[in-house]
Amino acid sequence: MYARLAFRHLALRPARTLLLLGGYGVGVAVMIVLLSIGEALLAQARDEKLVGGGDVTVLPEGIDVEVMKTGGLGGMYFSIDHARFIQLQLLASPRLAADVQAVAPQIDGTLLYLRTAGGSERTVRAAGEIPSATRAVGALPALAAGAWDDDAGDARWARPTPAQLRDDIDHFHLPPDELTAAERASWAEWHYFNVLSADRKRWAFITLLAGGDIPNGRWGGETLVTLREEGKSERRFVAYAPSSAVSLSTTRVDLAVGESRVTLLPDGRYDVHAIARAANGSGDMVTVNVVVSPAPRAYFPGAALGGAIVSGYAVPALRADASGEICASGACERFDAAQAYHDHNWGVWQGVTWEWGAARAGDYTFLYGRVDTPESDRGSLILYLVDSLGFRSLFRPSRIAYEDARTISVNGRSIRVPATARMIDVRGDDTLRVELQVDDAIGTDMRRGNERGGRGAAMAHPYFIQMKGSARLTGRIGGHPISGAGAGFFETYR
């Protein structure tokens, strides 16, 4: 009977009947699609590779979750750069302690190549986790047998001691094999320290450097010390050492250059000892014996560049104190918890110039910089800001607005140098304004070398300008105002 009624209705009103049947079919199709999507979402919500046992999963920017799950080409080699820095300074930092209970880093499905003792090579997929962290976020897998606990490598990654952290970011490097002979000859790597007296009138630049075709070519080391009193001439001291008198490590901070050395103490402080003779041939000596104590969490983990230039830069002690003694020409000055700074540079520096500065500003400390090469446009300028809880924010000012209203003499030539500088940036709701006032400046003709390690024979801007001055910052971060003032050192080229 129902079939007869349906066919009669179709015969009497075929258009309306077909429209109703079509609508019903579309409705069924939509329902099937929605149920399929819901099932997929439920499966993803239960997938431990995505959930990780916690409330939030952090993935690299731009990664497609479906591509990652299916192993597509776009998900083969993704990674989070400086993952340990993100863990220690962001996700597991004291700043978020009230909101983040636990953090667990995980590597899943990484492609590795395994070479057996017999010489054959196989491709394998590997995963990595830190057991204690995975347990803390509730994602510990069921163990059929045995135990799964942190080993020494896990503990060093997740909970490094101050000394371990600095060994990891402040060790030395060997020149890459792909460098040309000329590039290997211009390779240089150094520890740099500066120390400022309590009245901000006297300061020292201290560098221990290894350079050349390390380790099998022609290379050696230098110790360079510059002492300066505001408004007076600088005193430069230098000592050279052959490669046989240089000891460096690709896993540790420690460096020895002749009679000078930088030694990392077990508690993460730096013992700096330097001996050098006056560069003017007078025979005067300088002896540096200071211990540099980095402030907790005030460091920049490092960045490496490739392409037109091969270089790297890390700041293990963005904010630090120095205690000890510097003696020159028979007179000694004692420093007790004096403002100090330490960075580490490596790479090929032929013809390279830079903008750089680091200063305290009240409770804040900032670092800014940019590297420029003759073959490329200007690099990107960044400003890195920390406070007592560690990393605070990263800004990218478009430029440094210098006012070259000072004049200094370099080898008898008058050079115009900055008297003030200004940087401004707005990133979303966050704002920053930094104003620099230069109190003192010295210049070096880079064709003659300097204690910062750069070298260049034919540079458009060959005069390396080192400045000491005051800094003031203002702005807002995360809806809160920030401000501070202090002193620092700045560098540019003219």
Tell me the role of every PLM-derived stretch:
Residues 20, 25, 29-33, 74-77, ...:
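A short N-terminal beta->alpha junction/helix N-cap motif
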Residues 68-71, 115-116, 137-140, 205-208, ...:
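Short, glycine/acidic-enriched capping/hinge loops at junctions between secondary-structure elements
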Residues 32-125, 132-135:
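Hydrophobic, regular-secondary-structure patches
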Residues 146-494:
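Structured soluble/peripheral alpha/beta segments that form catalytic or ligand/cofactor-binding pockets
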Residues 1-31:
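N-terminal Sec/SRP start-transfer signal
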Residues 22-24, 59-61, 106-108, 129, ...:
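Acidic/polar N-terminal loop/beta-strand segments that form early-domain functional surfaces
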Residues 131-145:
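Diglycine-centered glycine-rich loop/turn motifs
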